[in-house]
Regions:
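Conserved glycine-rich beta-strand-loop-beta hairpin in the small C-terminal domain of fold type I
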Residues: 304, 308, 323-332, 343-357
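Conserved core of the PLP fold type I
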Residues: 83-216, 231-233, 238-251, 258, ...
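Short, conserved charged micro-motifs
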Residues: 361-367, 403-407
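N-terminal small-domain helix-loop-helix segment of the aminotransferase-like
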Residues: 18-123, 130, 310-311, 419, ...
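Structural signature of PLP-dependent enzymes
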Residues: 288-293, 310-332, 360-361
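Helix C-cap/helix->beta junction micro-motif
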Residues: 159, 219-220, 374
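PLP-dependent enzyme catalytic core of the Aspartate aminotransferase-like
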Residues: 373-377, 385-457
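Active-site PLP attachment segment
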Residues: 248-286, 391
Length: 457
């Protein structure tokens, strides 16, 4: 671990822990790392300082933006609200009453009432932060999946909590199994993170699994954080995704569930930063107070009006779902064409999936560099957890342009071949040497074996 500089020593202990965290921004490998390795011009690949690859000829299958974009109805509502001086000159509420009621039923499957409330926040990401801040104390334990969304682990640790991972694999169907959750619970467990659909696999929990996990948590006095932000698009036409809030009844009390969603994934509007937390008013009140004292930022009025229009636009949802199903079918065919590459589990909802490149004999990080060389941006697994961190690639298959998937079909075998030749070994190793995380050093050990093999050829 790198020693702290005198200035870094002034940071809080919580923040210092992120500097060398394997899931801290800049410490895990992404297509952005590949830009520098390849000596590309950032202005050509990601012009304007944007967070995604938008350069001409490039296709972004990395970060989870919905590349289909917003519905026309949402754009029109956004423009109208932005031009309304009466809206722009006043502070907005956290969430307009009409939107709050629609979100409660449309996203969480429950009506507003004395036992259920919705709070507007700055994107689903804001919901993650406020949920952790509201409920976690130093020493608490949080059950998460491995792999899982980048920020579930470091954000919890920033609050002083200890993360208890449950490995997702073929044995549990890449889902949380109640028996494994039960085994992970200790007297210190404060929260269980139920990301459903699960990022990065797109798998969904069954109703029975959700009810049993809810019962386990309820009996032990544990909060459930149910993140459902990927539940808008049904990749598998037969799949069913159930928001935990919708299971509330006299028999199955869900008052201990805090739910979070947003519009970035389902409605293609990440720039607007619109998200929602929902749960029992006594819990939501705590989140509201934390939010007010920390940021006091409510969702902007134009964004709220755009969201209201987007959620009412059912034809948009149908069209975008057709695109996503088409894209995954194409992606699946491509994977089948490449020996040593597999899809561990097919996604049910959302537009992210994982491919496993372990059978090719190279690391996902090397393949990431090769893919970008051939115009495809991707994310390898070391930012998602320890499990198969050098084998997994997470891919976004939401692009409306079929050329994206045709380009990927050409790029994947080329990227693998270049990686097998050892072209990117030293550069990937140098990245992890500089990051100096425990996970990265484990990947370096794999790379060292690869170097010996390449040298012997």
């Amino acid at each position: 671990m790198k020693p702290l500089s005198p200035l870094q020593q002034k940071l809080s202990k919580r923040t210092q822990a992120l500097l060398n965290h394997p899931q801290g921004m800049g410490n895990y490998f992404t297509f952005k790392t590949a830009i520098d390795i390849l000596g590309l011009d950032w202005a050509d690949v990601a012009p304007g300082g944007v967070y995604a690859v938008t350069g001409k000829g490039y296709f972004d299958m990395g970060y989870m933006a919905n590349h289909i974009g917003p519905s026309q109805a949402a754009v029109e509502a956004l423009c109208q609200a932005s031009a309304d001086e009466d809206l722009v000159k006043v502070y907005p509420p956290d969430c307009m009453p009409e939107l709050k009621a629609l979100v409660a039923e449309h996203k969480f499957g429950r009506k507003l009432g004395k036992d259920f409330e919705v709070l507007g926040v700055e994107g689903a990401q804001g919901g993650i932060g406020y949920t952790y801040m509201t409920f976690l104390d130093p020493g608490d334990e949080v059950i998460v999946t491995d792999p899982g969304y980048f920020h579930f682990v470091p954000a919890a640790e920033l609050c002083g909590a200890k993360v208890v991972p449950i490995e997702l694999n073929a044995g549990n169907g890449f889902r949380l199994k109640p028996a494994e959750v039960r085994a992970a619970i200790t007297p210190k467990t404060k929260m269980i993170v139920v990301c459903d659909p699960i990022n990065p696999f797109g798998t969904v929990q069954t109703k029975d699994e959700l009810l049993e996990i809810a019962r386990l948590a309820r009996d032990a006095g544990i909060i459930i954080f149910n993140n459902i932000t990927h539940n808008t698009h049904q990749t598998d036409a037969k799949a069913v995704q159930i928001p935990m809030a919708s299971l509330h009844s006299a028999e199955h009390d869900m008052s201990h569930v805090m739910s979070v969603s947003g519009v970035s994934k389902g409605y293609g509007m990440p720039a607007l930063r619109v998200g929602f937390m929902a749960g029992h008013p006594e819990l939501v009140r705590g989140a509201f107070l934390a939010k007010m004292e920390l940021t006091k930022i409510h969702i902007n009025y134009p964004g709220q009006h755009a969201t209201l229009a987007a959620m009412k636009d059912e034809p948009y949802l149908e069209r975008s779902t057709e695109i996503i199903r088409r894209n995954f079918a194409h992606l699946k065919e491509t994977v089948a064409m490449n020996p040593g590459v597999s899809i561990p589990v097919e996604p049910s909802f959302g537009f992210c999936t994982v491919i496993d490149v372990a059978g090719t004999g190279v690391t996902a990080q090397e393949v990431t560099v090769g893919l970008l060389k051939h115009k495809i941006a991707a994310i390898p697994g070391d930012g998602l957890g320890d499990v198969k961190c050098a084998d997994y690639l997470r891919l976004n298959y939401s692009s409306p342009d079929l050329a994206c998937f045709e380009t990927f079909r050409k790029a994947l075998p080329l990227a693998i071949k270049e990686a097998q030749e050892g072209r990117y070994l030293d550069a990937v190793d140098a990245f992890f040497a500089k990051a100096d995380t425990a996970r990265g050093n484990g990947i370096r050990a794999q790379l060292a074996k690869r170097k010996r093999g390449v040298a012997a050829q």
